[in-house]
Swiss-Prot record:
InterPro entries: KH_dom, KH_dom-like_a/b, KH_dom_type_2, KH_sf_prok-type, Ribosomal_S3_C_sf, Ribosomal_uS3_bac-typ, Ribosomal_uS3_C, Ribosomal_uS3_CS. CDD domains: KH-II_30S_S3. This is Small ribosomal subunit protein uS3. Binds the lower part of the 30S subunit head. Binds mRNA in the 70S ribosome, positioning it for translation. It comes from Aeromonas hydrophila subsp. hydrophila (strain ATCC 7966 / DSM 30187 / BCRC 13018 / CCUG 14551 / JCM 1027 / KCTC 2358 / NCIMB 9240 / NCTC 8049). The gene is rpsC. Residues 39-107 form the KH type-2 domain.
Length: 237
């Protein structure tokens, strides 16, 4: 049988950036890697209700900079920034170096693979029919400009005795085109019948400039909108 390579792994350095970017000598590499794992595990557990998309980690000059990509930044920041300050102290204690936390808002959660997968799992845990949850996710993604989306669920669907896999696709999802921007994510729904796995592939279009173009587009998206100049008022003066 044909097997599928991990869509994010095969595109690393081509259209996908790394989630951890730092350099370390042989002595410190394992410690840094384990520290990253612990930080991600802690933040995922603490922010399970904050629509967490991904966590990126950088280590400039004996410190750690964590960027939390979330659809609900208000939940992460908390009242007057209290919650984010608690997180910063906890991350500094785990990593053993001074920590800085940045919050990045995900503007279109319907086009984020991880958030779509988590949305489907939460619906399955609330006993929503799996076909309805899949179809709703696909329709929302296509409505907001996705070029294609595929959703796959597998397990004891609807409480069936025998586990099976069902999938639904709309549009194009070219997994072998390296310049294709494919957002792939997985999630698990813990139901009374057992665990149901959810996989999501979202095709957002082709990237022609490589990783530099991806980074430039991300920076442009995160930049705050400039206020429009009021030409009428200036003319009146």
């Amino acid at each position: 049988m044909g097997q599928k390579v991990h869509p994010n792994g095969i595109r690393l350095g081509i259209t996908k950036p790394w989630n951890s970017t730092w350099f370390a000598n042989t002595k410190d590499f394992a410690d840094n890697l384990y520290s990253d794992f612990q930080v991600r595990q802690f933040l995922t557990k603490e922010l399970k209700n904050a629509s967490l998309s991904k966590i990126t980690i950088e280590r400039p000059a004996k410190s750690i900079r964590v960027t939390i990509h979330t659809a609900r930044p208000g939940v992460v920041i908390g009242k007057k920034g209290e919650d984010v300050e608690k997180l910063r102290k906890a991350v500094a204690a785990i990593a053993g170096v001074p920590a800085q936390i940045n919050i990045s808002e995900v503007r279109k959660p319907e086009l984020d693979g991880k958030l779509v997968a988590d949305s489907i799992t939460s619906q399955l845990e609330r006993r929503v029919m799996f076909r309805r949850a899949m179809k709703r996710a696909v329709q929302n993604a296509m409505r907001l400009g996705a070029k294609g989306i595929k959703v796959e669920v597998s397990g004891r669907l609807g409480g069936a005795e025998i586990a099976r896999t069902e999938w639904y696709r709309e549009g194009r999802v070219p997994l072998h085109t390296l310049r294709a921007d494919i957002d792939y994510a997985t999630s698990e729904a813990h139901t009374t019948y057992g665990v149901i796995g959810v996989k999501v592939w979202i095709f957002k279009g082709e990237v022609l400039g490589g990783l530099a173009a991806v980074n430039a587009a991300a920076a442009q998206e995160q930049a705050p909108a400039k206020p429009k100049r009021d030409n009428k008022r200036r003319a009146a003066k």
